[in-house]
Amino acid sequence: MSLIRELLRAIRITLIFWLITAIIYPLAILVVGQGLFPYQANGSIMQNIEAQPIGSALIGQVFASEQYFHSRPSASRYSQGRRARPTGISGGSNLAPSNPALLNRIIEEANQLREENIQPIEDLIYSSGSGLDPHISIQAASQQIERVARARNVQPDEILRLMNKYTDGRFLWIFGEPGVNVLRLNYALDLQDFNNQQNR
């Protein structure tokens, strides 16, 4: 009899913990997230002026046009484009430093940057561990100002002002380095062009 009682008690405790961890806790987090942080809870999805999603401010993407700041290289190519690997996962290339394929990729990136008169700094030739970085360093963004200003036919000071506006500081003021959010900056450039055309 006591064995059955202990078994029923164990089942009851299991059901209570299942109810707490599988239903009550997730629902509480959902309500708090949607109530207090709806933008972040839904993936920080950015929309254009027509309310169409253009990407997440938390995940990098490819920008090939000369009018845009370019993101860091990605081993997964941000799951975009002809040579993308749409795996739905993040990650580096896992190529060893001695691997010729890695060296060839870096040399190719550096040569392409030199053709654009951009100094090949680390941020612009090395991919990150996640392969999905939404930010580039201030130095990497500064290297691209002239090219973007020329392509958009605006003064570099206008681009610099926007770049400073979309530079995120250190996390909790001490962790990491300041970085420029590439998607936010590129969309701000498009908005600026749109507003300039409307005012003409």
UniProtKB/Swiss-Prot annotation:
<comment type="function">
    <text>Part of the high-affinity ATP-driven potassium transport (or Kdp) system, which catalyzes the hydrolysis of ATP coupled with the electrogenic transport of potassium into the cytoplasm. This subunit acts as a catalytic chaperone that increases the ATP-binding affinity of the ATP-hydrolyzing subunit KdpB by the formation of a transient KdpB/KdpC/ATP ternary complex.</text>
</comment>
<feature type="transmembrane region" description="Helical">
    <location>
        <begin position="13"/>
        <end position="33"/>
    </location>
</feature>
<keyword id="KW-0547">Nucleotide-binding</keyword>
<dbReference type="Pfam" id="PF02669">
    <property type="entry name" value="KdpC"/>
</dbReference>
<keyword id="KW-1133">Transmembrane helix</keyword>
<comment type="similarity">
    <text>Belongs to the KdpC family.</text>
</comment>
<keyword id="KW-0406">Ion transport</keyword>
<dbReference type="GO" id="GO:0005524">
    <property type="term" value="F:ATP binding"/>
</dbReference>
<keyword id="KW-0472">Membrane</keyword>
<comment type="subunit">
    <text>The system is composed of three essential subunits: KdpA, KdpB and KdpC.</text>
</comment>
<dbReference type="InterPro" id="IPR003820">
    <property type="entry name" value="KdpC"/>
</dbReference>
<keyword id="KW-0813">Transport</keyword>
<keyword id="KW-0633">Potassium transport</keyword>
<keyword id="KW-0630">Potassium</keyword>
<protein>
    <recommendedName>
        <fullName>Potassium-transporting ATPase KdpC subunit</fullName>
    </recommendedName>
</protein>
<dbReference type="GO" id="GO:0008556">
    <property type="term" value="F:P-type potassium transmembrane transporter activity"/>
</dbReference>
<keyword id="KW-0812">Transmembrane</keyword>
<dbReference type="GO" id="GO:0005886">
    <property type="term" value="C:plasma membrane"/>
</dbReference>
<keyword id="KW-0067">ATP-binding</keyword>
<keyword id="KW-1003">Cell membrane</keyword>
